[in-house]
């Protein structure tokens, strides 16, 4: 029997490379569909953030007409409870998101700032309406030109006043950002092992400063 050796020609049209197809291992595909492949730390963060974004407890702080639109989102027509944010709290210590709906006056600014400081971590702020975003049409001495001058804001909802759908979209944007945050853990796990950092509460850390204060600030100061 005679054998003929033919040199491979990559430019030949017998089996061009662009038409070649690869077949995945069926066992590997089945494992990837049914087994979670990843680090335990990422799984913990994603699970905690999923629970956080679906259990936002807002602190209702309405200062103007935007609060009427905010209250409308709680009705059956818009049903804010679909997003887990219908549990309105009357105390900042039980809330984790502040919705500033309306005009922020200079007299009200210290109150907003004090209530924000009383909220527990993690906490977020939604600025609802043109007045809360930038002062709106009230460019006068008695109106703060944007609530972000006194507290940090995570989401701005435009409008005068914004429709309930706009507030719901802003809430969804906040939920999307929460899923990407890193959860502050009391116990850390890394390559060196498991350790628990000494995290002093903010209240205890500033206790000496509070005791040392002799001249309290006036209620109308920022």
Swiss-Prot record:
A GO cellular component annotation in the UniProt record: plasma membrane
Cofactor note as given: Binds 1 [4Fe-4S] cluster.
Topological category with respect to the lipid bilayer: Peripheral membrane protein
GO biological process: aerobic respiration; electron transport coupled proton transport
EC number assigned by the record: 7.1.1.-
Disulfide bond listed as a keyword: no
Cited InterPro entries: NADH_UbQ_OxRdtase-like_20kDa, NADH_UQ_OxRdtase_20Kd_su
Membrane-spanning segments: none
UniProtKB keywords: 4Fe-4S, Cell inner membrane, Cell membrane, Iron, Iron-sulfur, Membrane, Metal-binding, NAD, Quinone, Translocase, Transport, Ubiquinone
Binding sites annotated in the UniProt record for [4Fe-4S] cluster: 65-66, 131, 160
Main localization (coarse): membrane
Requisite cofactors: [4Fe-4S] cluster
Annotated region (Disordered), positions in chain: 198-222
Localisation: Cell inner membrane
Reactions the enzyme catalyzes: a quinone + NADH + 5 H(+)(in) = a quinol + NAD(+) + 4 H(+)(out)
Sample GO molecular function, one term: NADH dehydrogenase (ubiquinone) activity
Residue ranges, compositional bias (Basic and acidic residues): 201-212
Record-stated family: Belongs to the complex I 20 kDa subunit family.
Function: NDH-1 shuttles electrons from NADH, via FMN and iron-sulfur (Fe-S) centers, to quinones in the respiratory chain. The immediate electron acceptor for the enzyme in this species is believed to be ubiquinone. Couples the redox reaction to proton translocation (for every two electrons transferred, four hydrogen ions are translocated across the cytoplasmic membrane), and thus conserves the redox energy in a proton gradient.
Quaternary structure annotation from Swiss-Prot or TrEMBL: NDH-1 is composed of 14 different subunits. Subunits NuoB, C, D, E, F, and G constitute the peripheral sector of the complex.
UniProt-recorded name of the protein: NADH-quinone oxidoreductase subunit B
Species of the source: Psychrobacter cryohalolentis (strain ATCC BAA-1226 / DSM 17306 / VKM B-2378 / K5)
Gene coding for it: nuoB
């Amino acid at each position: 029997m005679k054998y003929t050796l033919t040199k491979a020609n990559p430019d030949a049209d017998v089996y061009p490379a662009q038409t070649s197809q690869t077949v995945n291992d069926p066992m590997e595909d089945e494992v990837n569909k049914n087994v979670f492949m990843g680090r335990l730390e990422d799984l913990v963060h994603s699970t905690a953030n999923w629970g956080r974004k679906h259990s936002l407890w807002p602190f209702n702080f309405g200062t103007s007409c935007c609060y009427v639109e905010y209250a409308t989102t709680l009705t059956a027509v818009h049903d804010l409870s679909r997003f887990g944010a219908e549990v309105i709290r009357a105390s900042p210590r039980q809330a984790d998101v502040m919705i500033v709906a309306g005009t922020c006056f200079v007299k009200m600014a210290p109150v907003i700032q004090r209530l924000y400081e009383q909220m527990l971590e993690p906490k977020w702020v939604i600025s609802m309406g043109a007045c809360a975003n930038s002062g709106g049409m009230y460019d006068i001495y008695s109106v703060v030109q944007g609530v972000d001058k006194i507290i940090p804001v995570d989401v701005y909802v435009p409008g005068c006043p914004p429709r309930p759908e706009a507030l719901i979209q802003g809430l969804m944007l906040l939920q999307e950002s929460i899923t990407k945050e890193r959860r502050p853990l009391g116990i850390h796990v890394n390559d060196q092992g498991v350790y628990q950092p000494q995290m002093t509460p903010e209240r205890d850390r500033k206790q000496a400063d509070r005791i040392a204060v002799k001249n309290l600030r006036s209620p109308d100061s920022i």
